[in-house]
Design a protein with these regions (language model features):
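Amphipathic alpha-helical interface elements
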Residues: 1-78, 85-284
Length: 284
């Protein structure tokens, strides 16, 4: 498992956030940070020489065979090279910078996508709870990709509609739900295994009473949940939008007991994402 020191991360993050630097410098910083993320993805030690466009990364990307990952690397490599060559006389535009930042977030998202290809999303409630501490923009990227490959996974759908709400708007979330009404109405709000556990725990009579009061299908559940959560956000504002705003919650409630490999691996990814970030204190 790759371990990195927080100091370089802090320097990179806050050089970007301060904003009093050119787009060229920002892209150079993002390229450097992206190389750190790639070391994490491919478990390349700091002592081993590596660049985004180098043969080491090209070989590793081929082995992964994931277009989401390779597309992000292509963007970072292309813009990074263009803006570090001295013969380029024009400054990168804000749109170009946005493309590079988006690709950087794709790399962070891939860490989780790769994890959930190994451990199916929704199989562990503790992992799901900690996953929700990630900023909504990053969750949206991850869940969008996972949904395309597992469209009947009710845990993905449940988290996805809330990520759309928190990253975009109530209208966007409701539109997404309505566009998939027919398919969502065919999905139960719980798996067969969960229903069987409920019956074993509470008995058939109490379980049936519980089942009768829950939403009839995923369309109804998602629609109601978006309406209710949107109302809470209107009253209280969002809990967090960035890593910095979420870090206090992550530190206090986001570290899983390392009792199995699934938790050890997830802790490693979460710690990597929050490494070097300052806490913006909020009340939870």
């Amino acid at each position: 498992c790759l371990h990195l020191k927080p100091a370089p991360f802090s320097v990179l993050f806050y050089a970007l956030i301060l904003g009093a630097i050119s787009n060229t410098t920002k892209i150079a910083i993002i390229r450097r940070y992206s190389e750190i993320i790639l070391r994490k993805i491919f478990n390349i030690p700091e002592t081993e020489r590596m660049t985004i466009g180098g043969s080491r990364i090209k070989e590793a990307v081929k082995e992964k065979n994931n277009s989401f990952l390779s597309n992000a690397i292509d963007v970072l490599h292309t813009y990074g090279d263009e803006n570090t060559h001295t013969e380029k006389t024009t400054l990168p535009t804000d749109d170009e910078l946005s493309s590079v930042i988006n690709a950087l977030y794709d790399l962070l998202a891939y860490l989780f996508i790769d994890y959930f290809e190994k451990y199916r999303f929704g199989t562990d409630s503790n992992v799901m709870a900690v996953f929700s501490i990630l900023p909504p923009d990053l969750r949206l990227k991850i869940l969008s990709h996972l949904y395309e490959n597992d469209k009947n996974n009710i845990s993905i759908i449940d988290k996805y509609v809330l990520a759309i709400l928190k990253s975009n708007s109530e209208e966007a979330a409701l539109k997404w739900i309505d566009e998939r009404k027919e398919s969502l109405e065919t999905l139960s709000v719980a798996t067969k295994e969960n229903d069987e556990r409920t019956i074993l725990q509470y008995g058939e009579e109490l379980a049936e009473l519980f089942f009768s009061k829950r939403p009839k299908n995923m369309y109804e559940l998602c629609y109601n949940k978006v309406i209710n959560v949107a109302e809470q956000i209107k009253k209280n504002g969002p809990l967090y939008k960035t890593f910095e705003e979420a870090k206090q919650l992550y530190v206090t409630k986001g570290i899983l007991p390392e009792i199995k490999n699934e938790y050890i691996e997830f802790n490693s990814i979460m710690n990597f994402c929050y490494l070097g970030r300052k806490v913006i204190k909020k009340e939870y």
